């Protein structure tokens, strides 16, 4: 997992600033190690209203400022602690949202898959996007939970015998293995319905217009223009020799990226983001959504079932077209790095400290091992 050292970023920017003052009134630097390629740091040399009269005075003033920066560096971003804290909050909210009640069987089935663990990447992205545009956790937590409920529904249905026929998910037997196909289908249906109820009823301190907009975004992300579209084309493409890169991208943008995109966009809308901010984050999310699937394809052929917590090599067995199958492992990895870079470029112009979680999440998705 990668993290962003904001302290090093700010300190290096400062040193570059000082080095250029004696050479030019205005220069622009693009930091070579900075993942935000399009974020150029412009150092404008402004005339002081009270000019310093000597070179020694300038040096003394700069040394004092540099010493102050070194003594009080901005804290680096701790991605592991961030995900642990967000994960705990999300798990508590999910636990409270769906208590064990009658009818017991359906609630047991819903909770079995929903609370089985998982990386909680989608709800974390929702919360991070909300905070990036000036909101807080409480404004987006119901939406974050709703996204995780819908994601869980998609996994339950995806594992069914009529779909991928899988028996392992998150290191445990799949829902239909434990509760039967009939209850598994109904558990997925119930999670889907309750997700929208939860956003509508539990979202507080957000205007009704923004809540309605968020509901519309989420519905579009998972319907016939989103997740379902990707799943249908994926099923129809099994065993086909006519699946090219364009069709594969369509499958994964819809089947995987659309829900990740929805998570980020919901957070931005509910947090009070402007239309411009929402669209930048939409593009960021689409890139990391496709990135997630490219990495998933790579892991499917390079890791074991034990390492993944789900059945490895199942796409190969089902004769599905994947990025490694079309591009090879190394070219797939290069494509993943390209998507990661392009995603992070969309965060240029946002507060770097607030953008740090989204940068780190993109790096995590790119370099995850399961």
Swiss-Prot record:
It comes from Hevea brasiliensis (Para rubber tree). Belongs to the FPP/GGPP synthase family. Pfam families: polyprenyl_synt (PF00348). Isopentenyl diphosphate binds at residues 119, 122, 151, 170. This is Geranylgeranyl pyrophosphate synthase, chloroplastic. Its EC number is 2.5.1.-, 2.5.1.1, 2.5.1.29, 2.5.1.10. Catalyzes the trans-addition of the three molecules of IPP onto DMAPP to form geranylgeranyl pyrophosphate. Optimum pH is 8.5. Residues 1-42 form a transit peptide. Its main location: plastid. Higher expression in leaves and flowers than in latex and petioles.
């Amino acid at each position: 997992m990668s993290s962003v050292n904001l302290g090093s970023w700010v300190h290096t920017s400062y040193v570059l600033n000082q080095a250029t003052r004696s050479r030019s009134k205005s220069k622009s630097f693009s930091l070579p190690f900075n993942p935000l390629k399009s974020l150029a740091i412009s150092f404008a040399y402004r005339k002081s209203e009270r000019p310093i009269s000597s070179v020694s005075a300038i040096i003394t003033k700069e040394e004092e400022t540099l010493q102050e920066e070194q003594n009080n560096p901005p804290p680096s971003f701790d991605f592991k602690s961030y995900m642990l804290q967000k994960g705990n909050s999300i798990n508590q909210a999910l636990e409270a949202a769906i208590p064990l009640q009658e009818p017991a069987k359906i609630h047991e089935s819903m909770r079995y898959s929903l609370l089985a663990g998982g990386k909680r990447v989608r709800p974390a992205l929702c919360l991070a996007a909300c905070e990036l545009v000036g909101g807080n956790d409480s404004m987006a937590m119901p939406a974050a939970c709703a996204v995780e409920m819908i994601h869980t529904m998609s996994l339950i249905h995806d594992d069914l015998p009529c779909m991928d026929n899988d028996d392992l998910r998150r290191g445990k037997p799949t829902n239909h293995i434990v509760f039967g196909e009939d209850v598994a289908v109904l558990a997925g249906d119930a999670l889907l319905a309750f997700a929208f109820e939860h956003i509508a009823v539990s979202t507080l301190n957000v205007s009704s217009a923004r809540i309605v907009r968020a509901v519309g975004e989420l519905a579009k992300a998972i319907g016939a223009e989103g997740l379902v579209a990707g799943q249908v084309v994926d099923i129809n493409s099994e065993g086909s020799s006519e699946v090219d890169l364009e069709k594969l991208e369509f499958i994964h943008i819809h089947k995987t990226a659309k829900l990740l995109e929805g998570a980020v966009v919901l957070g931005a809308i509910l947090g009070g983001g402007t239309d411009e901010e929402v669209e930048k984050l939409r593009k960021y999310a689409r890139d990391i959504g496709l990135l997630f699937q490219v990495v998933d394809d790579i892991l499917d052929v390079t890791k074991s079932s034990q390492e993944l917590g789900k059945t490895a090599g199942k796409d190969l067995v089902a004769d599905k077209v994947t990025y490694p199958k079309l591009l090879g492992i190394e070219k797939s990895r290069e494509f993943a790095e390209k998507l990661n870079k392009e995603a992070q470029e969309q965060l240029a112009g946002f507060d770097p400290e607030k953008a740090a979680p989204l940068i780190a999440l993109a790096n995590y998705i790119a370099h995850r091992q399961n």
